[in-house]
Curated annotation (Swiss-Prot):
Protein name: LRR receptor-like serine/threonine-protein kinase SIK1
Entry EC number(s): 2.7.11.1
Glycosylation sites: 72, 81, 230, 241, 312, 336, 381, 399, 416, 464, 493, 536, 541, 551, 584
Induction of its expression: Induced by salt and drought stresses, and hydrogen peroxide.
Disruption phenotype: Normal growth, but increased number of stomata in adaxial and abaxial leaf epidermis. Increased sensitivity to salt and drought stresses.
Amino acid sequence: MAAARAPWLWWWVVVVVGVAVAEAASGGGGGGDGEGKALMGVKAGFGNAANALVDWDGGADHCAWRGVTCDNASFAVLALNLSNLNLGGEISPAIGELKNLQFVDLKGNKLTGQIPDEIGDCISLKYLDLSGNLLYGDIPFSISKLKQLEELILKNNQLTGPIPSTLSQIPNLKTLDLAQNQLTGDIPRLIYWNEVLQYLGLRGNSLTGTLSPDMCQLTGLWYFDVRGNNLTGTIPESIGNCTSFEILDISYNQISGEIPYNIGFLQVATLSLQGNRLTGKIPDVIGLMQALAVLDLSENELVGPIPSILGNLSYTGKLYLHGNKLTGVIPPELGNMSKLSYLQLNDNELVGTIPAELGKLEELFELNLANNNLQGPIPANISSCTALNKFNVYGNKLNGSIPAGFQKLESLTYLNLSSNNFKGNIPSELGHIINLDTLDLSYNEFSGPVPATIGDLEHLLELNLSKNHLDGPVPAEFGNLRSVQVIDMSNNNLSGSLPEELGQLQNLDSLILNNNNLVGEIPAQLANCFSLNNLNLSYNNLSGHVPMAKNFSKFPMESFLGNPLLHVYCQDSSCGHSHGQRVNISKTAIACIILGFIILLCVLLLAIYKTNQPQPLVKGSDKPVQGPPKLVVLQMDMAIHTYEDIMRLTENLSEKYIIGYGASSTVYKCELKSGKAIAVKRLYSQYNHSLREFETELETIGSIRHRNLVSLHGFSLSPHGNLLFYDYMENGSLWDLLHGPSKKVKLNWDTRLRIAVGAAQGLAYLHHDCNPRIIHRDVKSSNILLDENFEAHLSDFGIAKCVPSAKSHASTYVLGTIGYIDPEYARTSRLNEKSDVYSFGIVLLELLTGKKAVDNESNLHQLILSKADDNTVMEAVDSEVSVTCTDMGLVRKAFQLALLCTKRHPSDRPTMHEVARVLLSLLPASAMTTPKTVDYSRLLASTTTAADMRGHDVTDIGDNSSSDEQWFVRFGEVISKHTM
């Protein structure tokens, strides 16, 4: 009987196994064609996936598709990483068919539409990041079905509606980041009963209601950020029970009342309460919060004195108390805060003197005491704060003189002593603070002459000495202020004539000299200040005629009022005669002008004739008595040309051949006899050292050849002017294309990356392969020229000193451009190869953002650092990059590289060889020797939870090559302000 049943049992087993195999093959159990079809459904929702997901072609092996990670046994899709691919369209409901999905990262795209309800069908999901898109609508309640979910990141979208209270039903949720959306309503109280929640980010929404006492129920919550909402009420008295908090930010809401005393029981590293309506005094107990690194109570309505016990906060680096109604004196005990780098007490009602104890703060970077009622002198030992970068005491009642020791503050870039009662002479030592970009001494009682040494501040952007009692002339040395944009010395007693050297200020926007005693004529050279938009010379004793240059016609009559001997030419009816200026010229005067012009023309023609006559050499000298300059030829394409040929081909350097201006030169285009075009650079100033030494340097530079360097073809040095002959670049400079007024050519991502690679390779050659090695010293976007194929060529390295083959490669020759200069230069006054690396990092930021290095008061590097601190760097990407880049992960890596290049300490920066190699690794696979691959299984395995990410930004570097990966590991993650 048993033997008879055996065949039937065998057939039953075969049928069961067959059905199971069939189900597995159809996708019912995990992988297979079912999930492949689901992925194709997901792709169909994306509007522009053709390029980014080119391998998503419906083929059999969906596990090999870009961004897809599968289980090795069942082939079920476990992870989907399509971040930073510039994807548009919507998230398809088909994603809900991927039942085994554990990891979804779609951040940094341009996805629109609503989050599909079907996302709740991905029941195995542990990590969901949809941040940095354009998603709108409500947060779907179906997300609460994801019982395995640990991290939910939806920040930086356009989501609306309330926060679903059902999110509290996700038992394993550790990270909830909904920042920078448009969410409304109260914060659900049930959220605070999730026992495992560690990170709650709700900043930048429109949430209302109050702070719930239940917020302290979360024993594991370390990050609580509700900054920038519409919360009201008071800070809960139970706030002291939030003992797990490390970051507490409730700033920029409408919180009122007093700061609870038991807030001192917190052990937070950051306590940020600014921008609310808090009243009362600062609790003394805050001075016991030893873990504080940042204390921000600014922009409230706090009263009373600053507690002296705050001096016990020995680990606090930032103390912001500005914008309150604080009274009393500045506690001397603040000098004990040895780690303090930012101290802002401005806009209060403080009295007394500036305590000398502040001079002990060796790490102090910014000191702002403006708009108080402080009296007395500036303590001399403030000059001991050698790291000080900004010092502002505007709007007090300080007196005395400027301490001579200020010259020790080599890092100082901003000095504002305006609207006080300072007296005496302006010390000439201020000219030694070589990194100053703003000097404001206005509205004081300074007297005596203006120090000529101020002309040494070559990085100065704004100079304001108005409303004092200064006398003497305007120093001719001001012509050296090549970066200056504003000069205001109005309402003084200045005398003498205007120096013609002011005409060298190519960046000057405003020149304000009204209400002085200036005499003489307005120098015609001022017409060379092509950036000048605001000119006021009224109420002086100027004479002669206003220059008739085109750019002077834009200035109104009011610019020249109160100069009885000054003739102003009216060019339209708008100037009128109502102001009493002389506008009529007699016939006799006209005849004299014409006669004088004829005589001048004759003298000029005679001088030209004599100049062109050959002159004998002076015995024993290599210089002719007079005659045309010699042309030194360094490349064969100029071998048949003479100096006279160049002058003839450019019509004596006629304006119509000008193709650009610089701070120290004008550039002309010249077409040689062969038809080849070259660029002729005419230097404004003569070489100050041995002419033969300069020739030797130029001959050395002319011998350097590299595909990414602009070649020097020849030069001509003489009292007539120094001319340098370079390659002509059809597409001008990178600065012109990024920031110029026309911007005719849009630079896509691939072009920008190739430009960065080319410039890096050129600079790497100068640093490492050139003999002698050369430090450029002025790397900037205007010194990166582009040929007809947009290949980058580094120019102006000829002005650098050659580095000898010794162990030290530093030099003391001062060069650089504001915005690009290494901060370390402020401390040491020395530049080296790593200074060039810093400048290149700024150029790379320009390429990525399309923004200028310095624009008015905005500093690109500081902007990116602040965004790095908020983990919003990708918001700064230029729109043309976003549109044309198919893998935004490459852009993030480029940002990382730029921030590595601009680290504060030179030893932490890479070399240019390393920079060039990493940039090469970012080029498209077709340009690489080996194709790039991305190991997403490694990413999935190493996904870091929020609890492990404190203070760090998790970014997948990819697996470009082992050496590149080691390089990134060597220098570490950089999207953290503490590592800059």
